[in-house]
UniProtKB/Swiss-Prot annotation:
Designated name of the protein: S-adenosylmethionine:tRNA ribosyltransferase-isomerase
HAMAP family, A to Z: QueA (MF_00113)
GO cellular component, one term: cytoplasm
Location relative to the cell: Cytoplasm
EC number: 2.4.99.17
Species whose genome carries this gene: Staphylococcus epidermidis (strain ATCC 35984 / DSM 28319 / BCRC 17069 / CCUG 31568 / BM 3577 / RP62A)
Signal peptide from the UniProt entry: none
Gene name tied to this protein: queA
Catalytic reactions of this protein: 7-aminomethyl-7-carbaguanosine(34) in tRNA + S-adenosyl-L-methionine = epoxyqueuosine(34) in tRNA + adenine + L-methionine + 2 H(+)
Subunit structure, interactors included: Monomer.
Keyword field: Cytoplasm, Queuosine biosynthesis, S-adenosyl-L-methionine, Transferase
Protein family (similarity comment): Belongs to the QueA family.
Amino acid sequence: MNIEDFDYHLPESLIAQTPLKNRDQSRLLVLSKDTGELTHLHFRDVIHYFEPGDTLVLNDTRVMPARLFGLKEETGAKVEMLMLTQIEGNDWEVLLKPAKRIKKGHRLNFGDGKIVAECIEELEQGGRIMRLHYEGILQERLDELGDMPLPPYIKERLDDPDRYQTVYAKESGSAAAPTAGLHFTDDLLNKIKQKGVHIAFITLHVGLGTFRPVSVENIDDHEMHSEYYQMTQETADLLNKTKESGKRVISVGTTSTRTLETIRRDHPQFVATSGWTDIFIYPGFEFKAIDGLITNFHLPKSTLVMLVSAFSNKKYILNAYHKAVEMEYRFFSFGDAMLII
């Protein structure tokens, strides 16, 4: 399959730059994955598509305020560091700007020494492995010194950083939000529970690879980035019970989907586990875990458009996207949502 097969025209004016005042007031485009039928609603109406006994799976990762601005100790030159992934202990994979002059052994100073980062390995494309030195708890230092790392297509400043977190965000570790979950409010989740729908949590820490464009023409040649995930025994038991009773597993977001499908690819049923996944889901993939998917609208020619095309089909997805453009839906992280079921 060619990357051009997953392209569509998106006017820049439809890229949402700020979140709506109320999370669940965003629009919802419901797509029947088997027939292609489209229904236009608001997100709060999603509850009408859930049935008692279904399980809704949410990613409880929390975005770190992981963009730091500091100085190179040796020269005082300004430097920006974006923390991506914890490797081990206090060692982190990061992106640096500018990166060229940061070599092994060089040290960076943030917040008058509240965080000091020492380069221990040089990677490609501005990447480095940095060893962090700080007193106390890293999350507290980041809350004090760091900025929220918004996606590259969002140009406006975010007044309230909590709007780039889900209301159930818990496990700190992401460089980007699992944006399908941004539409849920505590009130909506409570109403969903009252309907007899189960809520389950997984964790997948979203890396910046989610924004990296596909650089090959033949998508079979694309190499996916890896992301850390985990599932608890409680969640595994609930999902197995849901499947055994003939009810549906509805995934909130592509991150939850990648976690669930990774586990069911590797095991005959859901199990408590953790690890790294580089699963690449595109048309032809056999889904074993999910029966429904809530997701935002994704970038043209992205692996996420391929994922949703695999769950429904490419023709239905591109038709839905064209209709969403025509009706001026809001796109990407702060945009509107789809329910594919």
